[in-house]
UniProtKB/Swiss-Prot annotation:
NADPH binds at S15, Y16, H36, K110, A143, R259, V283, E285. It is found in: Cytoplasm. Disulfide bonds: none annotated. Sn-glycerol 3-phosphate binds at K110, G139, T141, K195, D248, S258, R259, N260. GO terms for cellular component: cytosol. PROSITE patterns: NAD_G3PDH. It comes from Klebsiella pneumoniae (strain 342). The lineage of its organism: Bacteria, Pseudomonadati, Pseudomonadota, Gammaproteobacteria, Enterobacterales. The active site is at K195. InterPro entries: 6-PGluconate_DH-like_C_sf (IPR008927), 6PGD_dom2 (IPR013328), G3P_DH_NAD-dep (IPR006168), G3P_DH_NAD-dep_C (IPR006109), G3P_DH_NAD-dep_N (IPR011128), NAD(P)-bd_dom_sf (IPR036291). Catalyzes the reduction of the glycolytic intermediate dihydroxyacetone phosphate (DHAP) to sn-glycerol 3-phosphate (G3P), the key precursor for phospholipid synthesis. It is an enzyme of class 1 (oxidoreductase). Its EC number is 1.1.1.94. The keyword Transferase does not apply. This is Glycerol-3-phosphate dehydrogenase [NAD(P)+].
Length: 339
C-alpha cells in the first residue's frame, strides 16, 4: 500500500474499532488500523485477527496494521476515531499536529466529555478548529455481529453534506451494512450517550427480577428522557425514533452482549459498583456517561428522573432496589408531561 492512498485511518483497535476497520476493508477499501499499544498491534499483525475480541474473524488483506501514529495519519485524509469518550479530547489533541491539511474527522465514540457533559462536536471544535469537516456514526451495533457481516444499520450525521455522502459510500454495503444519512448532528451524538445510561437501568431492573413489563416501561420512559434532553439542545425529535435513538436504546437494553446492561444486572443482583466493573473487564461507557448526562441535564434544567436514580446508585451508594422504588413512588402525572 502506498503511504497516501488508504480510504480511511481508524484510530482505536478495540473490538468496535477493529469491527469497523474490517467492515471498511471488506468493502474493498484499503484501511489503516492504529492502536496506542505497539505490542497489541504487533499481535494483531501476527494473528491477522483480533483474538481477544473477535477471534473468529480474519482480517481482509486490505486491512493494514500500524503502530506509528504519524504514518497512520499520513495514509488517509479521513480519520475514524473509535476510543472511549473520556479520552476523546486527549486523542484529538494527540493527532492534531500529525493530521494532513485536508483531513476530515468522523467518530463512532458514544458519550459526552468527561466531567463537563459537553457534546463531542464541541470537544472536536476546541481541539481541531472550526474548518475541519466533522461527522459521527451511531446506532445499534454490537462489534461481533458487525465484524461477522450480520445485517446492521446505523445513522450518519456530518457538518458537510459531501463528507456525509463520501462516508456513506465507504461504509454502506447492500448485503449487510446500511448507513442512513441524518442531518441532525446533535441528535445522532446525543442518543448514543443517553442509551448507555438507560441500559444500566434496564439491567438493574432485570437483575432485581422485575420482569419484562418493568424493563419495557423503563426503556420507554428512558426514550422520553433522551428526547427531552435532545429538545433542550435543539435536536430533531424524529432522530430519537431512528437508529441512533430508539434502535440503539432497544439493542443495548435487551441483549446481554451489552456491557452496560450486564453491569446493571450485576448491580441489581446486589454486587457493588467496583466489583461489577471488574467482572465486566472492559470499559463500561455508561458508568461515566451517567455523570456526564446528569451534568448536561442539570445545566439545561431538564428533569431526568431515571438518569438521576442511576447516578445515585453508581456514585452515591444507593441500592438498586431503593432507586427503583423511588421511581415507582413518583407522583402521578400525564404521560406527556415535561417532567
Amino acid at each position: 500500500m502506498n503511504a497516501l492512498n488508504a480510504a480511511m485511518t481508524v484510530i482505536g483497535a478495540g473490538s468496535y474499532g477493529t469491527a469497523l476497520a474490517i467492515t471498511l476493508a471488506r468493502n474493498g477499501h484499503h484501511v489503516v488500523l492504529w492502536g496506542h499499544d505497539p505490542k497489541h498491534i504487533a499481535t494483531l499483525q501476527h494473528d491477522r485477527c483480533n483474538a481477544a475480541f473477535l477471534p473468529d474473524v480474519p482480517f481482509p488483506d486490505t486491512l493494514h496494521l500500524e503502530s506509528d501514529l504519524a504514518t497512520a495519519l499520513a495514509a488517509s485524509r479521513d480519520i475514524l476515531i473509535v476510543v472511549p469518550s473520556h479520552v476523546f479530547g486527549q486523542v484529538l489533541r494527540q493527532i492534531k499536529p500529525l493530521m494532513r491539511p485536508d483531513a476530515r474527522l468522523v467518530w463512532a465514540t458514544k458519550g459526552l466529555e468527561a466531567e463537563t457533559g459537553r457534546l463531542l462536536q464541541d470537544v472536536a471544535r476546541e481541539a481541531l478548529g472550526d474548518d475541519i469537516p466533522l461527522a459521527v456514526i451511531s446506532g445499534p451495533t454490537f462489534a461481533k455481529e458487525l465484524a461477522a457481516g450480520l445485517p446492521t444499520a446505523i445513522s450518519l450525521a456530518a457538518t458537510d453534506p459531501q463528507f456525509a455522502e463520501d462516508l456513506q459510500h465507504l461504509l454502506h454495503c447492500g448485503k449487510s451494512f446500511r448507513v442512513y444519512i441524518n442531518p441532525d448532528f446533535i441528535g445522532v451524538q446525543l442518543g448514543g450517550a443517553v442509551k448507555n445510561v438507560i441500559a444500566i437501568g434496564a439491567g438493574m431492573s432485570d437483575g432485581i427480577g422485575f420482569g419484562a413489563n418493568a424493563r419495557t416501561a423503563l426503556i420507554t420512559r428512558g426514550l422520553v428522557e433522551m428526547s427531552r434532553l435532545g429538545a433542550a439542545l435543539g435536536a430533531d425529535p424524529e432522530t430519537f425514533m431512528g437508529m441512533a435513538g430508539l434502535g440503539d436504546l432497544v439493542l443495548t437494553c435487551t441483549d446481554n452482549q451489552s456491557r452496560n446492561r450486564r453491569f446493571g444486572m450485576m448491580l441489581g443482583q446486589g454486587m457493588d459498583v467496583q466489583s461489577a466493573q471488574d467482572k465486566i473487564g472492559q470499559v463500561v461507557e455508561g458508568y461515566r456517561n451517567t455523570k456526564e448526562v446528569r451534568v448536561l441535564a442539570q445545566r439545561l434544567g431538564v428533569e431526568m428522573p431515571i438518569t438521576e436514580e442511576i447516578y445515585q446508585v453508581l456514585y452515591c451508594g444507593k441500592i438498586a432496589r431503593e432507586a427503583a422504588l423511588t421511581l415507582l413512588g413518583r407522583a402521578r402525572k400525564d404521560e406527556r408531561s415535561s417532567n
